[in-house]
Design a protein with these regions (language model features):
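Non-catalytic positions within long, well-ordered alpha-helices that form the structural scaffold/packing
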Residues: 24, 92-93, 121, 144, ...
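Loop/turn positions that initiate beta-strands
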Residues: 256-259
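Short, Lys/Arg- and Gly-enriched loop/turn segments at beta-strand edges
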Residues: 269-274
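Metal-coordinating catalytic core of metallo-dependent amide/deamination hydrolases
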Residues: 2-17, 21, 29-137, 208
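Active-site-adjacent C-terminal substructures of enzyme catalytic domains
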Residues: 126, 136-252, 265, 276, ...
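Short aromatic-centered micro-motifs
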Residues: 284
Length: 293
């Protein structure tokens, strides 16, 4: 947070562009970018503007999410900070499509998260939530109650919560890179979710705590550590991932769908996870155009 506050907009553009290009080279064609490392209005705006700028470069599509409610900053008490997040929602709506809150023990309470998300909905944001990363602490149930578009993490969600998410039409976004990075064996129960018909997506969670831009690595972790099949990991990183950011025109190779395609040097799709540790992508095509990242 401190480094992000000190960085100029140009610094953030330069550093973010490197990561953005890495993601594209590894096969990501639509990228959700979240703020949350400013924890005060000016730096959150700076991050959101850089995220929007990346989407203008013609390298990949972007979806921008405001996540001012990522943590309580050290220089402010929680009541004052929640009030500041609420105050800024209307102004920040023009810079972001979605609003996300980290509802977890030690971060934002269920009631604080509900207050922020309901206000965000009234301001015109789509809703997302980080929930149940370490245990079933109410975030997943809140996601179901508010019918958010997606809920991230869910490693600690119980069967009751999984079924509530399913019944509310929420997409579960699983982030297997995160437990890997923090040396944890606490991966999301993907098999239980699939058995109970909860649609799941997977994502990198690329951040200082989980530093990877490679969706191929995430697919591999989904198979090796969460028990998903190669086909399930492919669905979770394409059409389901698109649905988790509100996109219904991509993620499938079919007539009338957006022509976002990857040409990979593999015998069939199963080698994306079977042959791990390398980049299989040879050519990235976005909206029918070959991309040089």
């Amino acid at each position: 947070v401190g480094e992000t506050r000190k960085a100029s907009k140009e610094d953030l553009q330069k550093e973010s562009l490197v990561r953005f290009k890495n993601a594209v080279r590894h096969g990501t064609t639509t990228i959700e970018i979240k703020s949350g490392y400013g924890l005060e209005k000016e730096t959150e705006i700076k991050q959101l503007k850089v995220a929007n700028w990346l989407g203008t470069l013609g390298l990949a599509d972007t979806v921008v999410t405001y996540m001012g409610a990522h943590a309580i900053p050290d220089d402010m008490d929680r009541y004052t900070y929640v009030a500041s997040v609420l105050k800024n929602l209307e102004e920040l709506r023009e810079l972001a499509e979605f609003c996300d809150v980290f509802c977890e023990e030690g971060v934002f309470t269920e009631e604080e998260s509900r207050t922020i998300l309901e206000a965000a909905r009234n301001a015109g944001f789509g809703l997302k939530i980080h929930a149940d990363e370490f245990g079933d602490t109410g975030g997943g149930k809140l996601a179901a109650e508010l019918r958010v578009i997606s809920a991230d993490h869910l490693a600690g969600s119980t069967l009751e919560t999984i079924q509530a998410l399913r019944d509310s039409g929420v997409i579960g976004v699983l982030l297997p890179g995160t437990p890997l990075a923090i040396l944890s064996d606490h991966f999301a129960p993907a098999r239980k979710m699939i058995a109970n018909n909860l649609p799941i997506a997977i994502a990198t969670d690329c951040n200082p705590n989980c530093y990877t831009e490679s969706m191929q690595l995430i697919q591999q972790l989904a198979v090796f550590r969460m028990g998903m099949t190669p086909a399930e990991s492919l669905v979770a990183s394409t059409i389901n991932a698109a649905l988790a950011i509100g996109k219904t025109d991509r993620g499938c190779i079919a007539e009338g769908w957006k022509a976002d395609l990857l040409i990979c040097d593999i015998p069939d799709y199963r080698h994306l996870t079977y042959h791990f540790g390398i980049n299989h992508v040879e050519t990235v095509i976005i909206d029918g155009k070959v991309i040089d990242a």
